[in-house]
């Protein structure tokens, strides 16, 4: 097949070759549009910033210095931050303060704080552009089959089933093949026992030159579509959940919901964010701040990152990451409005992503209470994330009670929750079943032609929506399981996640053995 990629020995300082791509009812937090490019040099922030403490060169120089390499570009958000470019070498001066580290650029000698998930230790496997850490096989397949990747694109990930082993995933035309990388007791790695390697880097170099039994030579590493989300806005705000509302700039109104508006904005004149403003009187600020302290600890790739809040005065502001394509509801309706459609495989994958986020909330004993397509947000590559988790509980009862004509989302709510206010993770499962109908009908309102009062009565008497047009029978069976009258007989989100992931996974994705040619 010829050489597509050659990893040269003796060049450990060569920057990792990552490909950078720019990154009705209630509207979900963080609804957005294409992100504003961050300026290379941040403007003067609205608050006085303490100068970064200077550490003498002698304290960190020498053999024990921690040298890391930048995996992505980063532009300073405050005067405390350090801007850097992908491939730049950084000396870590202090890594004891959580997710933001104090660093010095080896190139410019400037110092400042950096997000720790934007860098990796020099010469480590984490610094390699083909290492994707702990992602599932299904996620590897999705990434490799993106149009940005070509035949021979590959990645290495941690094995899902074998501790200390790895898996190699390779794009072969329109399919993905997987190979187990096993580790020898005495050290080293192999796919086929006839050929062993001291390091994963050597393994990649070998199979880049010669397929040696694989389906194809390894070519370019799988592209990275998204930059990671930082944990909080900056080092300065890591323990400062409440921020000054004067640090926010409202750029463009994105939409209005029942309880407030959603804006595209800037924090500190540097950082694109989504700002949700809650109408005065919607919820008690003290209750919201207490709930926000819990919400900020919920971290998962399928949950919208909550950055900060403004609760000192009303209206309350909620500041989150900005998603490029807005709410799932509007995204689906826009696709249908243009006469287009998505593959059923894509829709089911979106459902699996939502189930993964809800499985995490389930594991944390946390209830969403308002799971619907309007509260799920969409990014590039049909990546979806759950928003507004937990907020419904805080809405004042006179604003959000289960009565006909009120703002309560009757058609998404389990009967025990709508009639008796018995909310649980199992009532979220019911709502997930309704969300599945929104997916396959491109945002159609559930129970078409029925009023809220009719829905309450009919569902209580056993009525369930019929199978939507063009819906896979197996998917409709999952919907019916979600709508079981007995909450305890509804599936867990963990079960829903693997059912939907297995639904997506093709039979051709089994692990392969390297062939002896």
From Swiss-Prot:
Recorded phenotype for the gene knockout or disruption: Following epithelial wounding, no migration of macrophages to wound sites. RNAi-mediated knockdown in glial cells potently suppresses glial phagocytic activity with drpr not recruited to severed maxillary palp axons, blockage of glial hypertrophy, blockage of drpr up-regulation after antennal ablation and reduced clearance of severed axons in the central nervous system.
Binding site for ATP: 254-262, 276
UniProt xrefs under InterPro entries: Kinase-like_dom_sf, Non-receptor_tyrosine_kinases, Prot_kinase_dom, Protein_kinase_ATP_BS, Ser-Thr/Tyr_kinase_cat_dom, SH2, SH2_dom_sf, SH3-like_dom_sf
Tissue: Ubiquitous in early embryos, in stages 13-16 expression is seen in visceral mesoderm, hindgut, brain, anal pads and ventral ganglions. In larvae, expression is in CNS, wing disk, leg disk and photoreceptor precursors in the eye-antenna disks posterior to the morphogenetic furrow.
Top EC class for this record: transferase
Region annotation Disordered: where it falls in the sequence: 1-47
Statement: the UniProt record of this protein carries the keyword tRNA-binding: no
Keywords: ATP-binding, Developmental protein, Kinase, Nucleotide-binding, SH2 domain, SH3 domain, Transferase, Tyrosine-protein kinase
Residues of the active site: 370
Compositional bias per record (Basic and acidic residues), positions renumbered to this chain: 10-23
Organism domain of life: Eukaryota
Gene Ontology molecular function, alphabetical: ATP binding; non-membrane spanning protein tyrosine kinase activity; protein tyrosine kinase activity; signaling receptor binding
Domain SH2 as annotated: residue spans: 130-222
Residue span(s) of domain Protein kinase: 248-504
Known EC number: 2.7.10.2
Gene3D superfamilies attached to this UniProt entry: Phosphorylase Kinase, domain 1, SH2 domain, SH3 Domains, Transferase(Phosphotransferase) domain 1
GO BP, sorted A to Z: actin filament bundle assembly; adherens junction organization; apoptotic cell clearance; axon guidance; cell differentiation; cell migration; cell surface receptor protein tyrosine kinase signaling pathway; compound eye development
GO terms under cellular component: cytoplasm; cytosol; plasma membrane
The SH3 domain, residue ranges: 63-124
Catalytic activity as recorded in UniProt: L-tyrosyl-[protein] + ATP = O-phospho-L-tyrosyl-[protein] + ADP + H(+)
Family annotation (PANTHER family): TYROSINE-PROTEIN KINASE
Similarity-based family: Belongs to the protein kinase superfamily. Tyr protein kinase family. SRC subfamily.
Role played: Required directly or indirectly for the phosphorylation of drpr which is necessary for the interaction of drpr with shark and subsequent glial phagocytic activity. Together with drpr and shark, promotes the migration of macrophages to sites of wounding as part of a signaling cascade where Src42A detects production of hydrogen peroxide at wound sites which triggers phosphorylation of drpr and subsequent recruitment and activation of shark. Essential for correct eye morphogenesis (ommatidial R7 neuron formation) which requires the Ras1/MAPK signal transduction pathway.
Protein name per the record: Tyrosine-protein kinase Src42A
Lineage start: Eukaryota, Metazoa, Ecdysozoa, Arthropoda, Hexapoda
Gene for this chain: Src42A
